[in-house]
Structure formats: C-alpha cells, structure tokens
UniProtKB/Swiss-Prot annotation:
Gene Ontology biological process terms from the UniProt entry: DNA transposition
Keyword DNA-binding among record annotations: yes
Taxonomic superkingdom: Bacteria
Alphabetized UniProt keyword annotations: DNA recombination, DNA-binding, Plasmid, Transposable element, Transposition
Listed name of the protein: Putative transposase y4zB
High-level lineage: Bacteria, Pseudomonadati, Pseudomonadota, Alphaproteobacteria, Hyphomicrobiales
Region annotation (Disordered) ranges: 1-54, 334-356
Biological source species: Sinorhizobium fredii (strain NBRC 101917 / NGR234)
C-alpha cells in the first residue's frame, strides 16, 4: 500500500465484487439506467484555472501521500482502544474519468482510476490508501497490505487469492470473505449453531470445509463456511479461517462492510472529486489524496474538540465558515446578533497581523 513514496501504476485484469448482507449501491456511485456508472466529464479549464492545473501536473504526489499517512496514524492513536478487536475493511471504488483523460485505462466497464482503501471502522478513518489504474485487480493490491497479527480482514470475492489468505492465517490474523462461485469446497464436518438469528439475517449452515480440487495444497489452512439467509430471502456464502467466533458474529462482521461503502459515497459527494483541476495522471492522483487528507483533518478536528455531530453536518458547517474566524468547538452555534460590545476579529489563539 502507498502511504509514502511515489505511487506506482499497476496493470492487470480487473477483480470482481460480491453482494453484501446489507446491499448498497456499489461504491456509492449513482446508478444510471442499465446499471452503468456515470463518468466524470472534466470540462475545459478556464484561464483562471490553468495555472493551478499546470502546477498540479508538476507537484510531487508523494508529499500528499506521506501527509495522509501521518494524519491517518495520528487519528489511529487518538481512537485506539485497548482490548478491542482490530477490524480492517478492504475495498476499492472506481473513479470514472471523461474523454479529456485519454491516458486513463479501462477495466471493461469504466475508464479511469481506482481508489483502494483499508478502513478502520473503530476510528472511522482509512488507514492505508492506494490509487491505481481502473484495470488493476483488487487481489493484486491486497497482497501488498502489511498483515497485523490478531486483526480481522473483511473483503469481498474480488480479493480471492489463496496465497494471500494463507499468509493472513500464518500471521495469526483472520479473514472473512465470500468464495467465488467456481470454488469447489468439501465438507469435513458440520458445526453446531448455538445462536442463528442476527440483525436482519439468519445463519442456516456452519461447516468446516476444505478445497475439493486437486490443488488443495494451495490453501493448506482449515476453513469454515457459513450460509446466511438475509431478511429479503436471498442467501449468501461466507468463508473464514476464524474457528472461534460464533457464526452469528462472523456474519455480522461481513454485514458491517457497508461502512466502507458509505465512506466512498461520502467522499465522492462531499469532497469535490467529481471534477478535477488538471486532466493528467499526476493532477488526478494529487486531488484524490488531497480529498482524503481533508477527510482525516475533519475527523481529527472533530475528536480534538469533542464534536459528536454527524460528519456530514460537521463538513457542511466547516465549508460554510471556511473564510470566517469561528471557534470550531462552537461551530454549530449561530453568531451573536448585534453584540453589545465589539469582539476581536480573530480568535485569541490565532496569530494576526496589524499595523503599529
């Protein structure tokens, strides 16, 4: 994963993604008739925007990537809770680009780039971020993630790679995913389900399994298969190497993947990445990292000032007051009307300049 250094470009076949227990629009993209994603159409830049676009084409992306990594680490230290299970949600979202970005690669559905994220639901912040061409396989990026002992990694079927799954198990970590439809599994023994009912789903089968194909040596770890029936009547299959958690707890972990989908939706709708100042590869990467830096800064500011309002409302208030001198801890309070005495124009904790 890229948090420091110059982001690299990877090319391979695109991965696939599966449905969730709690279905939402894939990657938060607004659907068009026929299920196609709406492309970002960069418009020709105005004369006033051209100097900034030219600068974005030359600025080193590595500086922004390193800044995001430092902020993500700071936010993790603020929110870390001893004794809590470490959960890591892994997913990617496409960033469709228009015709002006002729350099963008296509994965068969869209032409553009792809943002890969490792998300910590406890701190509500991405821990790792990578930006690649749209045709890069999700499993290719997954194999570059540093595995944390004791953590549980939750991802969809696009991250199917037996070697990576084995590495997770050997690092004494866990994964919860969905197997591909062509993955042959043989039941070793049935497991007793103590509690079957969950929040909006029911676990109807729990079994220890192994690969049924001749290549079972490629995945020499014990596996557990769960069959889960959702409230809408559909059933899905989950696969994990966690043999201790209750079946209903594992199903609930996978259902929690909707949190990273909401993150993608929030970023695209509220951090202004639907249009870019610059149409080359460097400018687009730079603005994507800048959007994630803004997200991390908002989360840090909210926690330092004990702001408990929804992040969406906090973001809207910050945007409205961006060019005003306001106490961020009281940003939700309206400014005084006709104050009886003149108040200083700047915060007492903010440096200001004046003629003497």
């Amino acid at each position: 994963m890229i948090t420091t250094g110059t982001p690299t470009t990877r090319r391979s076949a695109a991965g696939t993604a599966g449905a969730d227990l709690c279905p939402v629009e894939r990657c938060g993209e607004p659907a068009r008739p026929g299920g196609r994603l709406e492309r970002q159409q960069p418009s020709p830049l105005s004369p006033g925007q051209r100097p900034l676009a030219d600068a974005n084409a030359r600025r080193p992306v590595a500086v922004f990537a390193e800044t995001f990594g430092l902020l993500a680490g700071q936010l993790d230290r603020q929110t870390r809770r001893e004794g809590r299970a470490m959960l890591r949600l892994i997913d990617s979202t496409p960033i469709p680009l228009g015709k002006l970005c002729g350099w963008a690669k296509s994965n068969g559905r869209i032409r553009g780039m792809k943002m890969h994220v490792v998300y910590d639901p406890d701190s509500d912040c991405p821990r790792l971020l990578d930006i690649t061409d749209a045709n890069v396989n999700d499993a290719q990026i997954g194999r570059t993630i540093a595995i944390e002992s004791g953590a549980t990694y939750i991802f969809d079927k696009g991250y199917c790679h037996y070697g990576w799954w084995t590495a997770i198990a050997e690092a004494k970590a866990f994964f919860v995913t969905r197997p591909k439809s062509n993955m042959g599994l043989k039941v070793v023994r049935q497991r007793r389900i103590k509690v079957a009912e969950g929040d909006g789903f029911t676990v109807i089968d729990d079994a220890t399994v192994r690969l049924a194909s001749k290549g079972d040596s490629k995945l020499p770890i014990p596996l557990r298969r769960l069959t889960v029936k959702r409230a809408d009547g559909d059933t899905i299959t989950l696969l994990t190497n966690d043999r201790k958690r209750p079946a209903v707890a594992i199903a609930a972990l996978y259902k929690g993947r909707w949190q990273i989908e909401l993150l993608f939706r929030w970023i695209k709708q509220h951090l202004k990445i639907r249009s870019f100042l610059g149409n080359n590869d460097n400018a687009v990467r730079l603005q994507l990292f800048a959007a994630m830096i803004a997200y991390a800064l908002l989360r840090i500011a909210a926690r330092l000032n004990r702001i408990t309002m929804p992040i969406l409302r906090f973001t809207d208030l910050v945007i409205r007051c961006l060019f005003e001198r306001r106490d961020i801890a009281a940003i939700e309070r309206p400014p005084p009307v006709n104050p009886s005495h003149r108040r200083p124009r700047c915060s007492p904790h903010q440096m200001s300049f004046a003629y003497v």
